[in-house]
Every structure is written in C-alpha cells, then in structure tokens.
Design a protein with these regions (language model features):
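Hydrophobic ligand-binding cavity/cleft-lining segments
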Residues: 1-45
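A generic structural micro-feature
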Residues: 5-7, 52, 69-73, 111-115, ...
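Intrinsic-disorder/low-complexity, polar/charged segments enriched in Ser/Thr/Lys/Arg/Asp/Glu/Gln
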Residues: 8-14, 21, 57, 74, ...
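Short beta-edge strand/loop motif at the mouth of beta-sheet-based domains
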Residues: 12, 32-74, 78, 166
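Hydrophobic pocket/interface hotspot
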Residues: 24, 34, 58, 79, ...
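Short Pro/Gly-enriched beta-strand edge/turn motifs at strand-loop
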Residues: 31, 58-62, 100-108
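Beta-strand/loop substructures that line and gate deep hydrophobic ligand-binding cavities in soluble
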Residues: 81, 86-150
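Short amphipathic alpha-helical signal-transduction/dimerization elements
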Residues: 153, 157-164
Length: 166
C-alpha cells in the first residue's frame, strides 16, 4: 500500500513491505541493493557510494534517457542520523561526479529549488513485516520528485520480493 501525503514543501510516502525490517534497512544502506531500485522507471544507478554513519558521506549517480537525450545526475549528501533498523536521515544536493555541490539551476531544476534537501526514512517492525515512512523535505509534494519517489518505491518493493525473504 502506498499513500502519498505531504505538507507543501515535503514529499511524504508511507509503504508497507512483506519483509523483515533488517532487509528494508539494507535496501537503503547497502550500495548494491540501493543501486537495484533507486530512481524512477527507466533509470539506472551505476555509482552508489555510502559511508553510513553520522557525518559519513554519500555519492550517487542516476542515469536515464530523456526526450533531450541521455542524462546523468549526481547527488551527494551527509548522513545526519543513523539508528540501525529504525531511522536514517541524510542530506541530498545535486553535485558533480566528485561530490562538489552544484547550483540546482545548473542541472535544470526549477527556480527556487533548494541547494540541499533532507531525506528521512523511518522503519517500524511489524513482526516480519515493515512499515516505512519516507519524508523528503525541501521539495514540493506535487513536484516531479514525488512521482520519482513513488516509482522508486515500487521498484524497491519488487527488489525486496525478488530476495525471497519473508
């Protein structure tokens, strides 16, 4: 079940998975799992570097075809909260491949798009199932980012199911 609701400047999506909380945690914190599901339909993630600890950095490359041709987008950030199997919070900024933060407008983002946003993932153990609440603060609820997250979480559910762990 996916529900999207949000304040004006945040995307909030709640999703339940038929999988243990530690598996869902690994989907967010292990690069090989993250690469398998992150991004909208048609996107691939060739690079995912994660130093999952408070103050640790992350660098992710998202590639996709667009009407204007192939696009490669890099995102960098820092982990602010890491509570294993419970809560993960990190910042996210558009960057170059070296993790240098770029102006969002340089990457075609709309005027007023913040240079840094925050992603929070909260997990609740439901006895073999997991409830996840994703909050991406700093982007409007009706932005393309909301649709991108919805697609990514559908891919996440399929990847979790493919693991065959219940």
């Amino acid at each position: 079940m996916a529900d999207g609701n949000a304040s004006r400047d945040a995307v909030v999506i709640e999703r339940s998975f038929d999988a243990p909380v530690d598996l869902i945690w690994r989907m967010w914190t292990e690069p090989e799992h993250f690469k398998a599901w992150y991004g909208p339909d048609g996107a691939v993630v060739p690079v995912s570097k994660m130093d999952v600890r408070v103050g640790g950095s992350r660098l992710v490359c998202l590639e996709m075809d667009t009407p204007g041709g192939p696009v490669q987008m890099w995102f960098t950030g820092e982990y602010r909260e890491v509570v294993e199997n419970v809560r993960l919070v990190y910042t996210e900024s558009v960057s170059d491949e070296n993790g240098n933060v770029l102006r969002p407008a340089d990457m075609g983002m709309p005027d007023g798009y913040p240079a840094t946003t925050e992603v929070a993932v909260e997990l609740t153990d439901l006895g073999g199932r997991t409830k996840m609440v994703l909050t991406h603060s700093g982007i409007p609820a009706d932005s393309p980012g909301a649709a991108g997250w919805a697609m990514a979480l559908t891919k996440l559910a399929a990847h979790v199911e493919a693991q065959g762990i219940r």
